[in-house]
Amino acid sequence: MEVFDMKSFLGDEVIVRQSSGYSCGPAALATVLRNLGVHCSEAELAELAGTDESGTTMYGLILAATSKGVSARGVRMEISDLRRNHIAFVRYGDTAHYTVVLSVDDRNITLADPAMGRIRIRRDIFSKIFTGNVLVVEREED
């Protein structure tokens, strides 16, 4: 008898959910930092990043990340260059949103989304909302 393995189905990553309609950036950054072993909260990162009711700038997220001892940089990239723990900036209509990449394959993108949790979206759909702007956060090498 095969036992259902919930961990392999859901994954072992932490997903920090956003607490407001404008805190997706700090929540996405908290997701990445916690998965890198850095203790932090969405609220702490929102304060460090200067988040307000209009949201969070990528520069603010970079400042928050570096204050937690990791390197962070904003870059432009294609979907094929996205990797695990990259924070992608997407736009649908007038709504801008940060989401964390878990995996990319030929057909789908799996995301740790601050608003919706773990989701899978077809690559062709994602290509319509992906702006090409990505925050890359990495542990600094000693």
From Swiss-Prot:
GO terms for cellular component: membrane. Pfam families: Peptidase_C39 (PF03412). Keywords: Hydrolase, Protease, Thiol protease. Transmembrane segments: none annotated. Residues 18-137 form the Peptidase C39 domain. The keyword Nucleus does not apply. The keyword Hydrolase applies. One of its GO terms (biological process) is proteolysis. GO terms for molecular function: ATP binding; cysteine-type peptidase activity. InterPro entries: Peptidase_C39 (IPR005074). This is Uncharacterized protein MTBMA_c00490.
